[in-house]
């Protein structure tokens, strides 16, 4: 096979320097067809096609780009087609099974492996038979009675070697098929679960958490690979046992049935243990799902948890679930240990019973029969050893299959009817439509008897108070709700902008283009109308900058504009926009409305949910919702004249009915805007190459010793040491038992000879030898049982400790870690990696130690008995170490790349589940399915290549092991006159086992190293940067700190990461106790950075912040954050109960919670339910509207009774009514607090004591509002003017009223017609 590595330097130099450069760029097999597909019969038989790749891995650090293309028959596209047909047949059955469908699709391939494996199994029985004949040959040669050819020993050597090699060839061909079949079943689960996830109905989604879905594609899918890896061993276990027993009977007669009786007696116990395993595993998986679900939720909301100093509460939530999971894991492990211990002890116990009975019956031992029988008993260890593993994995596979089947049978979303009537214009048509979020729940919110049309070139606006059903109407149009009655139809393509923008982890341009072809002219136009050009100029990489997961390096307004730009660029026919203007600045909102919605989209059907009353006069039609029903519709003026619900709604917003909307667009302001040079600080910065999300790094070289040490100490070093001593005692006692059998037979023969010669026999009697044999054998059994229990007990403790360390370490990580690390990558640690540590790693380590100690014992034993064997053994050992050395480079590289290529699958799943509504709206299902297939193909390429390398090594190790057997026969033949028959039997019986043990031992070593990569990856997260301590014992604030709530910023400089430009540049100011400070500024000016610095989510680079004269840097983070309160822009609720969301530490009595709910006007909502404070909150609070979520978050702040409150654009995403309620509650309840308000709506802060205007990370202006407005060239003046002429007048009156000391309610009565007339100013 041609080595695709770089050729020798000399060869390249003859071609000139340019040629060298050209060749050096092409490393490995990247882009080439898989050599396995092109290889001939001999190359496939010996796996020699992999030779060049092994050398390549030795010379280079392996990269994914070095791998060849995945074979066509292994690609996801091919597998998807195969399973689709099979599942279509299966789903028609009363009780469909996905596993059965998989067997139907790929079972024929597995039949080929059965054929090869049957030949391999047959070859295993040749060795013991030749052993018996070899002993007979030696005995007869010694006695001179042999009638066979004197060279027969050499012929036996060739026969044993030849049949063993045939068996090896067949075994690895069988393995080639089983591995592929297991991987195919794993792949189709990942593919079909993904497809199903983007089709699930809303009721199905509400009952299935993202954590559960991730578990299906990680743990459950992985079971297929694990089971198929040993499936043939299990299928042939019973035939092997029967054949072994039959041959045993042929050798030693009826004592065989004594051993059989022991095995039969163990079956009920094994069956009971297997039953318990099944029950425990099923419950255990449910607990694992729950733990992963909560962990995923916490990781997504880590910023909020840190801001509230809720780490302890949520740690308890996860660790309690983990403790319950560990209890079940202990139970599961103990039942599995019983199986392993019993089946591990049965061969030894059977040997003792069989040989004791044989001796008792015959009165002597025949070396040929005894050691031939011993070989058969050793053969029994293989099927018996695999049975507990197969039972455990089989149970897990059965449960996994059931879970996957149940998931795939969940109801799917019914797509909205596509209208193809050419006479109808594009638009949305709803006729007598009654829909609900969840049909299964009677109290589920929905829409009633909706008749709605939005068609042609029109702008329809949807308004209503909080909880009226505005977003529900949008979801119904998209087909996300379940239809009870009526019809919903859409003509034309759809573009959708959700209330909370969905951003993918890609470049800014890719987020906008969203898979469509690039039309540069349209793209530039879209950037202009969506007000993104200035933002793009701020990034050094322009629109090629990478947008982090969930858009973490963009502000809320930027994310929303990117979302709008995606919709506009799609050039759809119908635009459904769910309150997109709430998250953007006022002047940007006006620009978007006039330039985008009424500009570039003027020829489209636009449906706009809005809380901005001032834009209603520009709508062609307005729809008013109340309690899930349309109560009014018409133009703005028609609705005003009707004086019905719309008029009441205007009063809630404080708008005079006679007022006209501000009909100016931003053309008039553009000149002023251009004159005022915008100095805006960059948003969270990415690195110089444009990347923000860090690539997952693969460690190079062997797994470090400290990783193994980490695992050793995790479960208790002394317990591990105790288990290791027991491993040695177990191997030693078993070897000694077999050696004693040989010694007994030799001594028995010598006693017989002495008696025949009339001499006094020496040594122990046969009965004494029997007693020692039984005693040592029983000790061996006891050691095996104790070792098994102690080691697996240790393993569960280690798993518990590692999870505890990992979770606690993540809670202490700085926010920059979560900004740069995709959620899917972190979740992978808590699913796949932790599953390996929980369930698999201990088995691999135990098998590795058992096998390698057995090999070592064999080599020592046969070298002592046949010293001449050391001559060929030396080069064999050298070859073994060379092969193993080369293989480890290959194996390590592939293992790590396989692990790295697995994370993108989880990342993509996570991203898809967050944006499934957008994906469906834009009809991007197939595009995302192809992305999933590409990621899966990359991962499968690594995995299948790794398995091919295992076969490459295995065959060569088998060859070396078979050589040991061959040379053992050769030297026994050479020394047949001096070697005892019992030693011949002992040497050959052990030599026969060395091939399997050596091969399995090395592969287990590689497998153990692979699984240790999980410990290594988790250790990477345990190490690394951490936040400051939660509590500093010798520097704690007084219990009543802060008493006043004064804040001082002293030359504060802050940057997001070392090496990046500062985002806050020398902030210096003093805020007096109880002052109400408004903070304004353009996007990226540093408003939210002030909050991050105050809460120390990012530490100051220079300068300081003091509260009540105390430098906050000297306190622990918990002491600081628990004494502050924040109402963030995006309201975050957690699955659980209302009580848990309000009071995670359960510190407040019920009456206090109800009192707070009264204050925010939500008590009626919950008092009307039976659960009350225990009302269920679904994941992300999806069973509440955004306005209700924000009110609940306000209630959290009220319960804290803080001296300092921060409002971080807290009312940006709520309607005017909710905004008014929140503002009134804050004024009333927090009058004695210092309040910092980062505002989008200037009317919420114009009555502040002072306003801080930030520009480019510096304080541009800081004074009373009225004073600042006297400066006609000031930035605040410009921002006020941007809100529109009438609203600017109102804002100035607010500032003047504040200066003159008038009450805000008086101001409202004086000038109510101006209140919120135009866009509530957004900054």
Swiss-Prot record:
Residues 657-695 are annotated as: Disordered. It holds the Pfam family ABC_membrane. The lineage of its organism: Eukaryota, Amoebozoa, Evosea, Eumycetozoa, Dictyostelia. The keyword Protein biosynthesis does not apply. It is found in: Membrane. It comes from Dictyostelium discoideum (Social amoeba). It is a multi-pass membrane protein. Residues 672-690 have a biased composition (Basic and acidic residues). GO terms for cellular component: membrane. This is ABC transporter C family member 12. Keywords: ATP-binding, Membrane, Nucleotide-binding, Repeat, Transmembrane, Transmembrane helix, Transport. SMART domains: AAA (SM00382). Belongs to the ABC transporter superfamily. ABCC family. Conjugate transporter (TC 3.A.1.208) subfamily. The chain crosses the membrane at residues 111-131, 152-172, 227-247, 252-272, 338-358, 375-395, 712-732, 772-792, 840-860, 862-882, 952-972. One of its GO terms (biological process) is sorocarp development. Coiled coil: none annotated. Residues 110-396, 720-1010 form the ABC transmembrane type-1 domain.
